[in-house]
C-alpha cells in the first residue's frame, strides 16, 4: 500500500514547476483528509459539547463521583458524559459509595437477567401458569407501563427503579410510546426496553390495567383473595392519582413479604411515590445508606438514569449556547396553567413579577431618577428562560423589561424555546422539546416553578436547585404571598396514602417521620423528603 504513493525522483525531475506544485498540494491535501478522517469522531464530540476555554479549566468528573459507569461509547449518547460541561458549578451533592456500589451490582444483575437472556425467556414462560408458588426463579421483574405527561413519566420511572433497586428486581420499560426517542439506554451491555412481544401488553390489556383488573394487588388485598399459599405469576400495581390506600401501601412490610414472591410486577403510575418507601423499616435502613442526604434521591437517580438522545441533546446545546451561555446569571421560570386560561394571563404575570422581584431574582423597574444614575459601561446580563405552553408569558416579560430600565442597571433578556398552547403527550417532537426544556431549566442558577407541576419538579431536582414555588391561583387572582422558597429539592408525592404502615396505621402520613412531611406547594396533603427539620 505504501509503495503506491511513492513517486520516483526521475519522474519528478522531468515535470514542470506547475506540476510539482500540484503534486505537493495534492499530497498535502491527502494527508490532511486522512488526518481529519481519523479524528472525525473526536472533533464531533468536541463540537457537540462546545466547551469554551473557561469551562475546560474546571476539573473533569464525567462519571459524577462514580454515579456513572465508563462502559459506554461516548458518541452513542453525547449527553451521558457531556452534561457536566454545561453546568456552571459541579453539583455539591455527591453520591454515596454505597449507592455507587449498589448501581454497579444492579448493572450486572440486569445484564444477566435482561431481555434475550435465558433467564428472561424462562421467566416469560412462567407467565402463562396459574400459580408461581413452586419457584421464583433466579430473576424477578418489574414492568413500568408508560402513561400521562413526560414529567409524570420521569418521576415514576425513577420511583420504580428505586423500588427495583431495593427489591433486586429487573426494571423493564414499556417502549410502545417514545422512550427510545427521548432517552439513551442507562445500563451497559443490555437494554431496559421491554420487548414488544411481551404477552401482558397485547391489545386486550393495553388500556385494561386499572383497579378492576383481576390481578390488581390493591383490589385483591381488599378482598383477601391473595395469600402466601397461592402466589400468582404476576400482579398489577395501580399507583395513579385515583389509587386507594390499599394500592399505595404496597410498600409496607406485610405486603412486601407476599409481593416479594411474585415473579412479575406490572406498574402503572403517575406519581412520585418515593417518600412512601421510607415507611417500610427494612427499606428505610437501606435508603439511609443509599441516600445520607435524603433530599438527593431524585437528583442522583435522574442523573444516573436519564440521558437525552443525541437528537434531543442537540436541541439543548444549540439553544444554550445561542441564548444562555454568555449571561452573568440565568433564571428559569416554569409556568403551568391548570384548566383553561381563556386568555386570562394577567394574574399569572403579576404573580411571577411579584415573586421574582420580592425575592430579588429579577430587578425592580427603575424610577426616572434611577435610570439616569444607573449607567454602567459593562452592565450585568441576566438571561431569563421561560418554559410554558403559552408564549404570552415571555412576551409580557420582554415588553416590560425592554420598555423600562431596571433599577440595578442590569440588562434582562427573556427567552422561551416553545409555546405550543396544547400539551401533545406521545407526539415525538413535542416530548423531545419538553425534555430539552427540562434540561435547559436545570442549567439555570435559580428557578421559579408552578405548584403541583411535575415538569417543574423534574427540572429543579435534576439541577440540584431549591426552587421558589408559585402558589396555585384561585379565581384568577394573584396569591399573597405569591411564592415560597422550598427547603428541599425533592419532588412532591402529590397523592400519598393518608396514613402509614402497620404500627402507624392511625397516624397522618405527614407526621410519621421527621424527614417525610407535607409539601409546601399544596394546601393539604402531599409528601416530600426533607433534610432540614
Curated annotation (Swiss-Prot):
Topological relation to the membrane, as annotated: Single-pass type II membrane protein
Any one GO molecular function term: galactoside 2-alpha-L-fucosyltransferase activity
Pathway assigned in UniProt: Protein modification; protein glycosylation
Lumenal-side positions: 35-533
GO cellular component terms, A-Z: Golgi cisterna membrane
Cytoplasmic-side positions: 1-13
Tissue-wise expression: Expressed in roots, leaves, flowers and siliques.
A GO biological process held by the record: cell wall organization
Entry keyword Iron: no
Cellular compartment(s): Golgi apparatus, Golgi stack membrane
The protein's Enzyme Commission number: 2.4.1.-
Sites where a glycan is attached: 202, 227, 374, 396, 475
Range of residues in the leader sequence: none
Xref: InterPro entries: XG_FTase
Transmembrane feature ranges: 14-34
Keywords in alphabetical order: Cell wall biogenesis/degradation, Glycoprotein, Glycosyltransferase, Golgi apparatus, Membrane, Signal-anchor, Transferase, Transmembrane, Transmembrane helix
Cited function: May be involved in cell wall biosynthesis. May act as a fucosyltransferase.
Stated family: Belongs to the glycosyltransferase 37 family.
Name of the featured protein: Probable fucosyltransferase 5
Organism listed in the record: Arabidopsis thaliana (Mouse-ear cress)
GN (gene name): FUT5
